[in-house]
Amino acid sequence: FLHISGIDAAGANAAALEAVCVEQRRNFAEIQRYDRALLRSTTDADSYWDTHVRAKKRKEIRRLQKRLADLGAIKSRIMSEASDLPDWATDFLALEASGWKGIAGTALQCRAADTAFFMEALSAAQENGRLHFLRIDLDGKAIAMLVNFRHLDGAFSLKIAFDETLGRFSPGVLIEIDNLHAVLGDPSVTWMDSCAAADHPMIDSIWAERRSIAQFRIALKGSGLIRTRRAAAFAIAGAAERAAAYVKGR
């Protein structure tokens, strides 16, 4: 059988997969589902912030913004000129590598192939009008950066990086707040998918909406004994996955 993951459970792809499986008489089952943060609202950013974020958290954010501003000149920007891309991309790579990912060797800058892929992806997105790139600077130096990719009337969040030495000011949260204002202030963007893990404590506390992401198991074709064996394997796999989910949830 075939596993397909990362599918919007309520989207056209999931519906098409199920329709094809029904038509071809294939066994088809949803085996896993989780919800992740989604930003989708017709309200303005200030109203959304006041409605969906707890008063205590809003107060704490204002305090952090004030404390950070005491350190120097704070400037939030969205990249608008293609000529800025090389410098912005280089700044992002350096910022990510300056933290734990650099120490662990998992930052994009740690491998030449990953760096090249990232640069090519940003360049292609920029050329096609799909790049949404934000940053916060302290005295001209990037302390938080966020890369999003736009698609039709929506967008997907790709990567975030921030200065971990300034972690006490939550720069990652602050740039997500800038992002919230940018998205809800742009009539051409009706939604943004966080692409975050389930129950992510930071983004879940800011974005109120959720998108359900599913994994499906699809039986492969066969006949006679092969088909019987595959049907049995399909049933056994389903039972095992349900048992694993039960144990994990205890």
Segments (PLM) and residue ranges:
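Short, high-confidence coil segments that cap the C-terminus of an alpha-helix
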Residues: 1, 131, 186-189
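A conserved beta-strand-loop-helix scaffold within acyl/acetyltransferase catalytic domains
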Residues: 3-168
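Active-site/acyl-donor-binding loops of N-acyltransferases
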Residues: 19-46, 184-250
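A generic secondary-structure signal for well-formed alpha-helical elements
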Residues: 68, 72, 96-104, 183, ...
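Alpha-helix boundary/interfacial micro-motifs
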Residues: 113, 156-157, 170, 189, ...
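Short glycine/serine- and small hydrophobic-enriched flexible loop segments
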Residues: 120-123, 178-185
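Conserved acetyl-CoA-binding loop-helix of GNAT-fold acetyltransferases
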Residues: 168-181
